[in-house]
Amino acid sequence: MLPVLQDAILQYEKKYSSKIDAIIIFDPTAPLRIKKDITSALDKFKKEKADLVVSVHPCQHNPYFSMLEKNGKYFKLSKQKSINPGSRQEVPVVYEINTLVWIYSRNAIIKEKKRIPKKTVIFKTPYSRSVDIDTKDDIEKINYYLKKNEKFKTAH
């Protein structure tokens, strides 16, 4: 993704003799975003002077507590702290990136060249708007949220 964005920015700047400050990405697989998600994320981007504002929601499966990865013959927790947590309440809160809004600075794309740059700030969104369409089940979830919340339809 970054090489495409780098090329697009540089081509635009060359063609129009105008420098781009930031680029906003709206993933087409995230149809439940509302106008407020965009304006609030943009406000946060400006206020925090971030290189990336990315929308997130609380992670349903915390890697400090309930996710395993292969470790040789056996498995271990994906992320570990010095404590041995006995409950989910004892581990750090973790957020999952969703694709409602990504706002990158020019610096992040052209100079830092990282998907998640050092100056990343999160924009929290509710899980009910964070559904990505990757499977048929996801389409059913979206239909459920749309039927459940009629006012959502008018928030666009």
Question: Model-derived features: where do they sit?
Answer:
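Hydrophobic helical membrane-anchoring modules
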Residues: 123-124, 128-156
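Short, well-ordered alpha-helices that flank and scaffold nucleotide-derived cofactor binding pockets
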Residues: 10, 43, 144-148
